[in-house]
């Protein structure tokens, strides 16, 4: 890891020289690219300095502890060593994650689709809980969320919830949320105190960039239907045909949007989802053709694959792909997902590039 840090620090000096050149402003695109690289490298530098300083304090405490005789001071130093060791471990993981080379698609916005699976009303309620969890996580990362489409269940929660999320490194941290999320808990309507199991499926679809030439949709290939939007229980909530259903005839992909009162806005949102789904289908097809990529994936990303279990009675969350088990489910449901998402990103990087690059 030290070698990688030195390489980054050397590159940071080069970038700072390039940015300080007045001629750089004549090329806005290059300036923007260098500014982003400078921010990433500066973060690595700061994290490395924090780690070095913490290691020095820990070393001093251990040295003092080896010669100290006073019981009170010994107890204080022992506590300092314990705190220092935890800090070194945490800062090392943080630095390791920062050293992961950025993917050009890391900053792409994503469309996240959550659907109730097995478990009926309880599954729909858990969709609502997951929606809240992801909104809180997004807020903690400074990301923006936009509701694209919802289908409420009769007893609360959602049969389906689709939202767009944008911001720095959105795709990097959310792409591995795709799959089946299983929940084990006692429903509020359960009188015998029995634990029920239900499931929610999650799809994470990167939105194509505006200049992405891979995604071209011919208007001739679309069938667009309009109808009155309806809420929970099927009752109509709008007297005009504002809801939109778009069918991409060649692929058979169908997208419905009815949350907005404006037909124009519903159509625009539906087109965003449609483009993301078509792009995702192409990406999945290429991934399946690349055996090297398949072997390095954290699971298949298939919605039918069970990736995580949320056990409320035990306050436990387990990610089955990397064997990670945490006993702080309450914190995870409050949006503290970094402890899982960063572990997944690190795991994938180690598989793709080998542990020696970050060790």
Curated annotation (Swiss-Prot):
Modified residues (N5-methylglutamine): 235
Post-translational modification: Methylated by PrmC. Methylation increases the termination efficiency of RF1.
Primary role: Peptide chain release factor 1 directs the termination of translation in response to the peptide chain termination codons UAG and UAA.
GO cellular component: cytoplasm
UniProt similarity note: Belongs to the prokaryotic/mitochondrial release factor family.
Alphabetized HAMAP family for the sequence: Rel_fac_1 (MF_00093)
Species: Chlamydia trachomatis serovar D (strain ATCC VR-885 / DSM 19411 / UW-3/Cx)
Listed InterPro entries: PCRF, Pep_chain_release_fac_I, Pep_chain_release_fac_I_sf, Prokaryotic/Mito_RF, RF-1
Keyword terms, alphabetized: Cytoplasm, Methylation, Protein biosynthesis
MF (Gene Ontology): translation release factor activity, codon specific
Pfam families: PCRF (PF03462), RF-1 (PF00472)
Protein name: Peptide chain release factor 1
Record region (Disordered): 287-312
Intracellular or extracellular location(s): Cytoplasm
